[in-house]
Amino acid sequence: MTVINMKDVDLANKRVLIREDLNVPVKDGKVTSDARIRAALPTIKMALEAGAKVMVMSHLGRPTEGQYEEEYSLQPVATHIAGLLGQDVPLVKDWLDGVEVESGQLVLVENVRFNLGEKKDDEALSKKMAALCDVFVMDAFGTAHRAQASTHGVAKFAPIACAGPLLSAELEALEKALAKPARPMAAIVGGSKVSTKLTVLESLSDKVDQLIVGGGIANTFLAAAGFPVGKSLYEEDLIPQAKALMAKTSIPLPEDVVVATAFAPDAVATVKDAADVGPDDMILDIGPKAAAAFAALLEESQTIIWNGPVGVFEFDQFGGGTKALAMAIANSKGFSIAGGGDTLAAVDKYDIADQVSYISTGGGAFLEFVEGKVLPAVAMLESRAQN
């Protein structure tokens, strides 16, 4: 993959516009998980230390496009970055007509999704963004799969368009895991629906030696194998696809599960064999026997791709499975990549960030890369590098 790298561009006294993925959870005006912010900091610091006039942009949530909505303001993010850097980080609300910023100074510009035309990759909006800078840095792997004004259009029109260190590292790590993986290779795909991850499951089924499924996805596979799933979330219409996947690749199913009769923080957890799930039961985690069996597979693996928890780990009584797999990944001697929002929250919760080889900040982009799709923002950087 040939793109211009930010580290090879002279940034001194240049107006540098960096697109980061700072779409973090915010509650009561405070950032509750800052993994994506911390991942972006080295890029921001590198630009500041080079003497650049640094403007950072990102989206947050899904506001109504073209309208300011306070709950989606990046103010909590600006405050959080200021705390981490130990310097003021002003948030600029009306920024498309120009931003005042000095060399060595950082400003955050307000949520890109407040601008009409962002999602449609509007050309006029893209040109306004490009006019703000001498150098555009695409560093948001998490949005690289979307052709939008702040990820794709601006890269087309900026004087120089390059990849930031975070984006470059993401692409290198994913290529290492997918192009020439060390064997045996395992993947964990969790989440609520097979329908949203079907292409990922199909793509990985051709590559991996073991495909571990979790969450609501696993319930569809259990149903396909003839196990009772009670009132669990599952997709009956996708049972044929689940059967086809099980026929062509090794998808170990949990021999035991953790069930409850209600989905609630105080729900009582009961461990049952997979064959004994009752009509009123909801499967909310894999059981201890399954967790131990899957953990053993992971500890033997030389390459691990982890996307999605295997249970409702937000409630501790349904977090045992995800914790066991997280610890197995941490203990594995192989190359491991974790990606996707819920996955990052699990990495945080079980404090294994330092033991995972690479933590991908991308959710959808991570999955699309795994599927083998072209990421529009990366394709644009490649095309600019050639010209």
UniProtKB/Swiss-Prot annotation:
It catalyses: (2R)-3-phosphoglycerate + ATP = (2R)-3-phospho-glyceroyl phosphate + ADP. InterPro entries: Phosphoglycerate_kinase, Phosphoglycerate_kinase_CS, Phosphoglycerate_kinase_N, Phosphoglycerate_kinase_sf. One of its GO terms (cellular component) is cytosol. It holds the Pfam family PGK. Substrate binds at residues 21-23, 36, 59-62, 113, 146. The keyword ATP-binding applies. Its main location: cytoplasm. It is an enzyme of class 2 (transferase). One of its GO terms (biological process) is gluconeogenesis. Its EC number is 2.7.2.3. Monomer. PANTHER family: PHOSPHOGLYCERATE KINASE, PHOSPHOGLYCERATE KINASE 1, CHLOROPLASTIC-RELATED. This is Phosphoglycerate kinase. It comes from Marinomonas sp. (strain MWYL1). The gene is pgk.
